[in-house]
Amino acid sequence: MDPIRKPAWLQKKIIPAAHAEMEGLLKELRLNTVCQQARCPNITECFGKRQATFLILGRICTRLCSFCSVSKETPLPLEPGEAASVAEAVKRLGLSHVVITSPTRDDLPDGGASVYAETVARIRSVSPATKVELLIPDFRGDWAALAAVVESAPDILGHNLETVPRLYSIRSGADYRRSLDLLAQARRMAPGLNTKSGLMLGLGEEEAELFAVMEDLLKAGCGYLSLGQYLAPSRMHHPVQRYVEPELFERYKERALTMGFEHVESAPYVRSSYHAENYLESKFPPPEGEG
């Protein structure tokens, strides 16, 4: 089947020269970003603002999700100084909000949870004012691993459901209920924790299914939601079934807020970490005259 042509509202230019400085720093510190690995269409905008989502635990994923462009090979050993390097980058960039994520590492005993916790601790030690957001895998339902991450006290803990239950075959090795349980367990472990999830639209989901997932997330105590358009990385990946109009994204945002979410980012180019700083600002607005 021939791919659906992208509409005008999804024509976004990537300008490599605009983020040469950021890429130089990442290369110097031997760091990866999901912006690069997942071929994010927002890379020029975010790198131009000196914002990035750091990818820890290497560049290689142990799962074979049909929507994702992150490398799927034999994972390499962990970099011993990775957490310290991320903290150094946060300090040098003067970041007020940082997002940390990783590929899924089912080959590691704790799924990489200890590295997440170490990274948070390292960032806190050199840049205590920085808000730290984690976007974690499911750790195969290992709640001890999850507890190690929760105990590191991130400002936001994210885990993406990605799509509706009927389409979960695109998420190799994942389970819808397990992902929901992870978000609920995190809130049980730390009732005041801000939790977040993201969904891709255009995979073939029905509107009623989308609203049902929103209800499930709210029942799991998830207060933050991101909705964005799925874009197939190549012809080898799961094909786009529909390009959702910007007006519909806005309607979904209004619906989600009415249902009870604290903050929602919903637009074609929204990704989990896009405008990440907005979520906490909606809960803790700056004093009048600032921001």
From Swiss-Prot:
Residues 47-262 form the Radical SAM core domain. One of its GO terms (molecular function) is 4 iron, 4 sulfur cluster binding. GO terms for cellular component: cytoplasm. [4Fe-4S] cluster 2 binds at C61, C65, C68. Its EC number is 2.8.1.8. The keyword Hydrolase does not apply. Pfam families: Radical_SAM (PF04055). [4Fe-4S] cluster 1 binds at C35, C40, C46, S273. Keywords: 4Fe-4S, Cytoplasm, Iron, Iron-sulfur, Metal-binding, S-adenosyl-L-methionine, Transferase. The keyword Coiled coil does not apply. CDD domains: Radical_SAM. Pathway: Protein modification; protein lipoylation via endogenous pathway; protein N(6)-(lipoyl)lysine from octanoyl-[acyl-carrier-protein]: step 2/2. InterPro entries: Aldolase_TIM, Elp3/MiaA/NifB-like_rSAM, Lipoyl_synth, rSAM. It is found in: Cytoplasm. Belongs to the radical SAM superfamily. Lipoyl synthase family. NCBIfam families: lipA, PRK05481.1, PRK12928.1. PANTHER family: LIPOYL SYNTHASE, LIPOYL SYNTHASE, MITOCHONDRIAL. This is Lipoyl synthase. It comes from Citrifermentans bemidjiense (strain ATCC BAA-1014 / DSM 16622 / JCM 12645 / Bem).
